[in-house]
């Protein structure tokens, strides 16, 4: 085997785009939290920065239009190609901040396709095919030159806790996003939001800003994300490397 040569360089942090996941049970405040984060990021990017919102919830995509300034693409189909086309539409129009609300519909689409393609009990090939389709959108999000906030419904479970009257009562909690296994680890920060308190806990945090904190996600959180991501050397083009 011929000798392989490597170039050894000093590691330096480079500026990157924010890529985060907000998950939680239905009613926990994922969409609202995503809009607050996006508003904080957009303010840091600069005056006139527009927020693009890729929605899958029909009329619910417009619930907060009186509180936040954002432009909307409502998806009518939930295949990876539709998600990717919507991202490209915003990128081509110059948007620097994008919300995808939510990715759960994509995962439901994947599961539906597997069911349709399965013959007998052999789901292995179908899962292999459509998990690759699912991975396409993840790669698109991670490589897109824009700050992207993704939401996903949590895998709901119920726990018994004492209520305000001291009686044990069931409470719905999210235990990971309704997405492919370990998908939360693809993002810079992944939060799980509590349904009752709307408080978010970072279950994975590359920034170390949110570790050990349980808080409401707001514009200040978005500003902190942007500042961390923008702290570093400008990314060089391939020709400059």
Label each PLM-derived region with a short phrase.
Residues 1-6, 14-20, 27-28, 197-241:
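C-terminal regions of RecA-like/P-loop NTPase motor modules
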Residues 2-97, 104-105, 109:
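Conserved P-loop
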Residues 25, 139-223:
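Phosphate-binding/switch region of NTP-binding enzymes
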Residues 31, 76-84, 97, 124-143, ...:
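Amphipathic alpha-helical transducer elements in NTP-driven molecular machines
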Residues 56-58, 103, 153-154, 196:
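An acidic- and aromatic-residue-enriched active-site/binding cleft used to recognize and process polar
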Residues 65, 108-114, 160-162:
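Short, conserved acidic/polar surface loops in the N-terminal third of protein domains
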Residues 70-71, 114-118, 166-168:
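Glycine-rich, phosphate-binding/catalytic loops in enzymes
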Residues 100-130:
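Conserved P-loop NTPase nucleotide-binding/switch module
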């Amino acid at each position: 085997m011929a000798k392989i040569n490597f170039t050894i360089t000093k590691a330096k942090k480079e500026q990157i785009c924010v890529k985060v996941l907000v998950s939680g049970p239905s009613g926990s405040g994922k969409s609202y939290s995503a809009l607050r984060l996006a508003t904080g990021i957009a303010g840091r990017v600069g005056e006139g920065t527009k927020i693009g919102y890729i929605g899958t919830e029909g009329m619910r995509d417009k619930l907060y239009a009186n509180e936040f300034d954002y432009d909307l693409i409502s998806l009518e189909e939930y295949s990876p190609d539709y998600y990717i086309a919507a991202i490209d539409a915003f990128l081509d129009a110059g948007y620097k901040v994008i919300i995808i609300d939510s990715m759960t519909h994509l995962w439901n689409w994947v599961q539906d396709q597997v069911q349709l393609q399965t013959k007998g009990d052999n789901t292995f090939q179908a899962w292999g095919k459509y998990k690759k389709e699912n991975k396409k959108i993840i790669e698109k999000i991670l490589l897109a030159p824009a700050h992207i906030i993704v939401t996903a419904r949590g895998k709901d479970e119920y726990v018994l806790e004492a209520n305000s009257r001291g009686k044990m009562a069931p409470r719905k909690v999210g235990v990971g996003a309704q997405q492919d296994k370990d998908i939360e680890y693809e993002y810079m920060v992944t939060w799980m939001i509590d349904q009752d308190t709307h408080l978010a806990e970072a279950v994975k945090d590359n920034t170390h800003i949110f570790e050990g904190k349980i808080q409401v996600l707001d514009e200040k959180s978005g500003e902190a994300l942007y500042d961390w991501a923008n702290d570093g050397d400008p990314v060089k083009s391939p020709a400059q490397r």
